[in-house]
Regions:
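C-terminal secondary-structure termini that scaffold catalytic or DNA-interacting sites
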Residues: 130-133, 191, 210-241
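Non-catalytic DNA-binding core/recognition domains of DNA-processing enzymes
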Residues: 1-18, 32, 108, 141
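Catalytic-site neighborhood detector that most strongly recognizes the C-terminal catalytic loop/helix
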Residues: 44, 97-101, 178, 185-210
Length: 241
């Protein structure tokens, strides 16, 4: 749908240019409206899909590093391809998002740190590089990541952006609040966070919610439990008679 929208925008610009120069009497795309289908956007990777990718691409490969960067930083492809060792200090990754301009400080997950350490450094500026040691552009990286997914036997719906959504899902399942998730993803809108975390495991989250409710109720009952030494017990009178 985004591709159709870009094509329509480009055509309208071209036809307006023609109209201004009297090459056209009317703008042919006038009145055209794209019907946007209801969608949650990119597919959120499942744990089985993540496991399949990991089973095919071993630690130490660029493919495995790309997966880890997507899962443990929750950043977009355009930001991930720019990440280098110079952006990591004292276990914290500094990211300035290309799309929003937001500056983020992201603690490095131990698993990501181990994978970075196990991956041979080819380039000097970025962690992800081509075989020749050059940094990826966002588009070329997307093509390469899709090839890695194909090699792992994953469906075409598994794209890199889906790892960002999987990261948000994992955070939600871990009990993180919307504000905590946004602190990592860089989202300014909590509504967008809600859309990202719709794939969270509803059943396990519901069990945790009910357990919290039960624990709170139990705590409240214990706080109002009567003290036998302070409250008169009518049975004592019967016993003493």
């Amino acid at each position: 749908m985004a591709t159709r929208r870009r094509w329509l925008t480009a055509l309208r610009s071209f036809f307006r240019w023609c109209e201004q120069r009297k090459l056209l009497r009317t703008e042919p795309t006038w009145g055209i409206r794209l019907k946007l289908p209801k969608s949650d956007g990119h597919h959120t990777w499942s744990e089985d899909e993540i496991a399949a990718f990991e089973a095919h691409h071993a630690v130490g490969s660029k493919a495995r590093l790309a997966l880890a960067l997507g899962l443990f930083t929750a950043q977009r492809r355009g930001d991930v391809v720019k990440i280098g060792r110079q952006h990591i200090r004292d276990g914290v990754l500094a990211v300035r998002q290309q799309k929003t301009g937001a500056s983020l400080a992201i603690p490095i997950h131990p698993e990501l740190a181990a994978i970075i350490a196990a991956t041979p450094a080819v380039g000097q500026l970025t962690l992800l590089t081509t075989k020749s040691g050059r940094s990826y552009s966002a588009c070329v990286f997307s093509e390469q990541f899709c090839a890695w997914c194909d090699a792992a036997g994953l469906p075409q719906q598994c794209v890199f952006h889906g790892l960002r959504k999987a990261a948000a899902r994992r955070l939600a399942e871990a009990g993180c609040t919307a504000h905590e998730i946004a602190a990592l993803t860089g989202h300014a809108s909590l509504r967008e966070i809600e859309r990202y975390t719709r794939a969270a495991d509803q059943a396990s989250m519901a069990r945790r919610a009910m357990a919290k409710t039960a624990a709170r109720e139990q705590s409240g009952m214990e706080s109002v439990k009567p003290d036998a030494n302070k409250v008169s017990n009518p049975l004592k009178k019967l016993i003493n008679v």
